[in-house]
Regions:
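Conserved ABC ATPase "signature" region
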Residues: 16, 20, 27-45
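Hydrophobic anchor residue at the start of the ABC signature
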Residues: 63
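Conserved catalytic motifs of ABC-family nucleotide-binding domains
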Residues: 70
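Catalytic Walker B motif of ABC-type/P-loop ATPase nucleotide-binding domains
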Residues: 74-77
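ABC transporter nucleotide-binding domain
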Residues: 93-186
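C-terminal coupling/interaction segments
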Residues: 161, 185-229
Length: 229
């Protein structure tokens, strides 16, 4: 994901170059460039060399160059890789604005929170599309939470050792650390068993809460099942 524009040209010069490459007539060129500059929010950087921009502003410039000829479909390969959280959110807000104007985006990402923002999500594993649907459709797949099971969030101290304890229980199918808690796939109605087993192992006041699966749960479950085949 290297910066693909010309670092020794200014923002305006890069946009002018791409407008000419895409065949935008001279009489319309300046107006269209000003439109994409405003849309990408890079008005204050017209004369800045592209190579001197931060990661987030480089991505905005790259998007502006790609939009200058009014495409209806765009492919974005990890567009937020290497940029800070604020720039990442601002870039996604820009993509939503463009989507509302009729532009369709195909986005590749390793960030599951970004996948949650998409209308449809496809998982590719070893170059094969293994599933595709809306985020809600994927979370409701029987393969993700098989009948008779439930996904639970377990809040307790010493997560690594608690995870090892639960992983050995016959009623637990899967357990992983997720931020400051454990995500557990277990038999339905096993909340009290989890609390009792952890309390017996020295974990008082354990909280066990039913939760819906996340897209990360979907991704991990699907890939693990295929690794086991």
């Amino acid at each position: 994901q290297q910066f693909s524009l010309y670092p020794d040209l200014t923002v305006m010069e890069n946009l002018t170059f791409y407008a000419r490459i895409y065949g935008i007539p001279r009489r319309n060129r300046r107006a269209r460039i000003e439109e994409v500059i405003a849309g990408a929010g890079i008005q204050d950087y017209r004369k800045r060399l592209a190579g001197q921009l931060s990661g987030g502003w480089k991505q905005r410039l790259a998007l502006a160059c790609a939009l200058v000829h009014r495409p209806r479909l765009m492919f974005l390969d990890e567009p937020t890789a290497g940029i800070d959280p604020v720039a990442r959110r601002e870039l996604w807000n820009l993509l939503f604005d463009l989507s509302g104007q009729g532009v369709t985006f195909f986005v590749t990402t390793h960030y599951m929170d970004e996948a949650e923002r998409c209308s449809h999500v496809g998982y590719i594993y070893f170059s094969k599309l293994i599933v595709c649907g809306t985020p809600n459709e994927l979370k409701q797949l029987d393969e993700i939470s098989p009948p008779g099971t439930a996904r639970l969030e377990v809040r307790c101290p010493r997560l690594p050792s608690a995870m090892r304890i639960l992983a050995e229980k016959p009623y637990v199918d899967d357990v992983t650390i997720f931020a400051d808690s454990l995500h557990v796939l277990a038999e339905q109605g096993s909340e009290h068993r989890i609390s009792a087993d952890l309390e017996a192992a020295g974990y008082p006041q354990t909280q066990v809460i039913p939760i819906p699966p996340t897209l990360e749960d979907v991704f991990v479950t699907l890939t693990q099942r295929r690794k086991a085949v």
